[in-house]
């Protein structure tokens, strides 16, 4: 099975869309603040990350951290097979500015990503309600209530983390 971090043939020349600022900062903080990697892995659902390159780089960062907690950027760049991913990861850490309280900023970003994901899903549920059967209505309304309740709580470790 081919790796999914290589663009399909014919798309290799097309530039990758830049991630939005929230996901770019997620990537930056994930790669710079290695002390927060375990916390991030326990609290971030990669499904909340919409940019495929950011999601893949963070996923690879987590995998590398499990294998070698002392691994840094050179090792990460060594396992990223896409040049576009390598450029994005390098760009995220390149400016070298000191970031005040990176752990707090990372928590704020993960909370924001979670809430954006929930808002997007709530909008999807609202659209689905129109044509739903009675059985689907019950499930959708229950999911909507569960998501709304989740937004009232602070970030907690994900199930299984």
Language-model segments: residues:
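Non-catalytic protein-protein interaction segments used by genome-maintenance enzymes to assemble
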Residues: 1-69, 89-95, 119-122, 153-158
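Bacterial replisome coupling helices
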Residues: 62-161
């Amino acid at each position: 099975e081919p790796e999914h971090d290589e663009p399909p043939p014919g798309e290799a020349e097309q530039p990758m869309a830049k991630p939005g600022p929230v996901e770019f900062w997620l990537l930056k903080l994930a790669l710079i603040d290695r002390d927060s990697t375990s916390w991030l892995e326990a609290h971030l659902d990669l499904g909340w990350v919409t940019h495929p390159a950011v999601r893949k780089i963070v996923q690879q960062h987590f995998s590398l951290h499990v294998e070698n907690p002392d691994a840094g950027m050179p090792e990460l760049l060594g396992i990223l097979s896409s040049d576009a991913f390598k450029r994005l990861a390098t760009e995220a850490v390149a400016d070298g500015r000191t970031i005040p309280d990176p752990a707090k900023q990372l928590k704020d970003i993960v909370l924001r990503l979670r809430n954006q994901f929930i808002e997007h899903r709530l909008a999807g549920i609202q659209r689905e309600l129109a044509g739903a059967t009675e059985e689907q209505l019950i499930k959708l309304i229950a999911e909507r209530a569960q998501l709304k309740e989740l937004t009232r709580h602070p970030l907690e470790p994900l199930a299984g983390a």
